[in-house]
């Protein structure tokens, strides 16, 4: 087991989570106002509806982890999100909210900088994907699956059989694809399973998925902390299935880690986390 392996993640605390949810709620408010003006086309209307469903689900999940005094409804978060937009767009702290201030307002020698060039803002230290190191989470009875010299269909079936033996709760799964003693793929997954009364098992939380290429280089990663998790059971089931499907190409050609990563990251719309070079590997 790769207990001594160093991996990478973005660390997102509860403050950033609240800010993100509130900002997206503000975006939803803008979408709705545009819709009321009959200025939203059909694709835009579809995005509005999907964003609203996702936000309602995410707020419900997030509120469970918050003390009752800090729980907020979607409508309350919309109001805060609109104020955040005013701060971001106009750099006007008087339009803002407590605890949220643009980076330049806190760090510029000139507090009145409405013409700041956003491209000049330095990044927040340590928040790049490759800047924060993390050890794999320790989980009781971690599972390692070695897929050696078998076709992709058999490999996929073995993964499904192994995963179905996982107990409810947190899990760590390491998948190694080995063809003719060449390690062509390694995937490390951390998450949480929920088992339903009918025996159906769904992935409720996907905390991390790391994909490594033939040389052991980490080519892509999807990491969530705090309550940034799979937003509903359907998402979790689809994401896990997308991982399985990468092993079902119908031939014995080694599967590249980048292809696997693209397949999984695309479920979150996170393909941009791969550079073009990594995506082509």
UniProtKB/Swiss-Prot annotation:
GO CC terms in record: host cell cytoplasm; host cell nucleus
Region G1P2-binding, residue ranges: 1-103
Presence of the UniProt keyword Transmembrane in the record: no
GO biological process: one example: symbiont-mediated suppression of host type I interferon-mediated signaling pathway
Stretches the record annotates as RNA-binding and homodimerization: 1-93
Motif (Nuclear localization signal): 50-55
Record-linked SUPFAM superfamilies: S15/NS1 RNA-binding domain
Localization (cell): Host cytoplasm; Host nucleus
Functional description taken from the UniProt entry: Binds and inhibits the conjugation of the ubiquitin-like G1P2/ISG15 protein to its target proteins. Since G1P2/ISG15 is an early antiviral protein, NS1 may inhibit the host antiviral response. Prevents EIF2AK2/PKR activation, either by binding double strand RNA or by interacting directly with EIF2AK2/PKR. Also binds poly(A) and U6 snRNA.
HAMAP family recorded: INFV_NS1
Protein's name according to its UniProt entry: Non-structural protein 1
Species the sequence originates in: Influenza B virus (strain B/Victoria/1987)
Taxonomic lineage from the root: Viruses, Riboviria, Orthornavirae, Negarnaviricota, Polyploviricotina
